[in-house]
C-alpha cells in the first residue's frame, strides 16, 4: 500500500475518497479530542459522500457515560461540515452526578485556508479555521441554574505529515481555540470566552495483512473554571490513543484511548476521571 494512501486512511494526510475516514470526538476530522487541518473528502467541484461515527467515553461513576453519533461531509476539497448528537447516562454519585444531563446538539464546520505542500513546497503544513457550536447544554453550571445554554469554539489549526522518515511517518498538529465551553460542553460553560492551545503527535505503522496502526497523544488546555464554580480548577486534558485501520479497501477505522480528564478539582470535590477509557468507530461511504 502506498504510504500517502496509508496516511489518508488514518486521516493524517489529505483525505482521499478511496481511503478510510476518521472523525474526532465531536464529529470533525481529527484524532480524539483535537481537530486537524485536513477536511472530509470531496471533489474540487462538488461534495463528497458522508462520514458517520459513533463515539463513547466512560466518564466514571461521577460523570457517567458519554456517547455521540456524528455525520460529516466535505465540499470542494476545502470545506467540511457536520452535525453530532451527544447523549449521556448519569453517574451514580448523588452529590455530584445530577450536574450532568442527557444530550445536546453539536454543529461544526471547517475551511482549509492552505493545502498541505502548497506551491509544491514539502515543508508547508495544511492550515484550516473552524468553529463548533453546541446548543441545549444542561451540564454543571447550567444544571445549577436549571437552564440550557449555548457555547462554542472557534479555532485555527496547522497539521503536517512528515514523510521523510518513510518507515514511520510522523504527524504533527497544533492550534489555538477560543472557547466558552468547559470540556467541550461536558463541563458546561465558562464565565467568559478564553484562548486555549491544543496539539497532537502521531506515529504511523504498517501492520500485518495490509492493516495499519497509528499511536498518538494529544493535549488540550481547558478554561480554568466552569461557570458557577469559581473555586473549581480544570486541568489540561491529555489522551493516549491507537487507531486501527483493518484494510484500505474498507472505509472504516477503530480508535481506542485513555483520557486524563479531571480528579480533585476543588476541596472535597473529586470527579474521579483521571484515566477514562474511550472508543470510537468511523465509516466513510
Where are these regions (language model features)?
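Repeated loop/turn-to-beta-strand initiation elements of outer-membrane beta-barrel proteins
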Residues: 51, 77-83, 115-120, 165-170, ...
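Transmembrane beta-barrel domains of Gram-negative outer membranes and organellar outer membranes
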Residues: 20-154, 159-164, 227-230, 282
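Outer-membrane beta-barrel "beta-signal"
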Residues: 106-113, 260, 270-285
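Cleavable N-terminal export/targeting peptides
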Residues: 1-28
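Detector for outer-membrane/organellar transmembrane beta-barrel domains
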Residues: 147-229, 237
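Membrane-embedded beta-strands of outer-membrane beta-barrel proteins
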Residues: 69, 107-109, 156-158, 199-201, ...
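Outer-membrane beta-barrel translocator domains and adjoining extracellular loop/strand segments
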Residues: 93-98, 138-145, 183-190, 225-235, ...
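Transmembrane beta-barrel strands of outer-membrane/channel proteins
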Residues: 54-58, 83-87, 127-135, 172-178, ...
